[in-house]
Design a protein with these regions (language model features):
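RecB-family 4Fe-4S metal-dependent nuclease core
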Residues: 1-169
């Protein structure tokens, strides 16, 4: 992605479910490959597909660190030490790879982590939300009910905004 970040509020309202749905499918594929094994996702991430822009005056080590920071994954991590260690083997302080940091008392508040039961609740919610949305579509429900979050709404880039009849007032 460009600068896309995982937004839990947008996810909750069904506006940012694609990443979780893809992860669900990846879990299903792995379960088929490894019957009888429990597949536990480590996290849900966006990867920055861009050329990182960093200062050319940096030495090689600082340059690599700056590039890693620019390309750091964004999303949510299952908060389990073994999972975090596999995602970033050199994890200490602030990770250059995942959205996580450590303090003397544990993980930093800026870390984007969910306890295993919270992470599983996100997956369960996504399955229910997806099923509900599919059911509504199959029943023919197609109302003009665009979302509104902050300064954005569903009409902003909609190609049908001029003909749908929805009053944005």
């Amino acid at each position: 992605t460009g600068a896309k970040s995982f937004d839990m509020a947008a996810f909750y309202h069904g506006l940012q479910m694609q990443l979780v749905v893809y992860m669900e499918e990846a879990v299903r594929l792995e379960e088929r490959k490894h019957p009888g094994k429990k597949i536990v996702p480590a996290g849900i991430f966006y990867y920055r597909m861009k050329d990182p822009i960093v200062g050319k005056e940096l030495d090689e080590e600082k340059l690599e660190e700056a590039i890693l920071k620019e390309l750091r994954l964004d999303g949510i991590i299952r908060q389990e030490d073994a999972v975090i260690q596999r995602l970033d083997a050199d994890f200490s302080g602030n990770s250059l790879v995942i959205p996580a940091g450590k303090t003397k008392s544990g993980y930093s508040k800026a870390s984007k982590m969910l306890l295993p039961e919270e992470f599983d609740a996100v997956l369960t919610y996504a399955q229910k939300r997806r099923t509900d949305l599919q059911g509504a579509m199959y029943r023919g429900k197609a109302e003009a009910l665009p979302y509104e979050m902050g300064t954005q709404n569903g009409c902003t880039y909609c190609p049908y905004r001029d003909i749908c009849g929805f009053d944005e007032q």
